[in-house]
């Protein structure tokens, strides 16, 4: 369980920057999925159930001006930065585990 800070900048304007903190990397990846789900709900307010494919989630991540994580490293007592590609890899692993497949 490594404390993780998610940095999000949806648009080009630096004023759109926000951050969230989580108790673990997996919790943070779930947070990224929730951000996308909220985005879908805003775009489709009359749709009772939101469904999406991982490629749609990754397209959303790619279109954000910036998305990165700072993950606490206990051994050095510092935070290490990670980019969108790393985040997508972690989301992929998380969703595979949730689906019950392990290859």
From Swiss-Prot:
List UniProt keywords, sorted A-Z. Answer: Cell cycle
Query: Is Protein biosynthesis found in the keyword set?
Result: no
**Name of a matching Pfam family:** ER
SUPFAM superfamilies reported in the protein's UniProt record: ERH-like
- Please give the start and end residues of each transmembrane region: none
Q: How does it assemble?
A: Homodimer.
Q: What does this protein do?
A: May have a role in the cell cycle.
Q: Which family does it belong to?
A: Belongs to the E(R) family.
What is the protein name given in its UniProt record?
Enhancer of rudimentary homolog
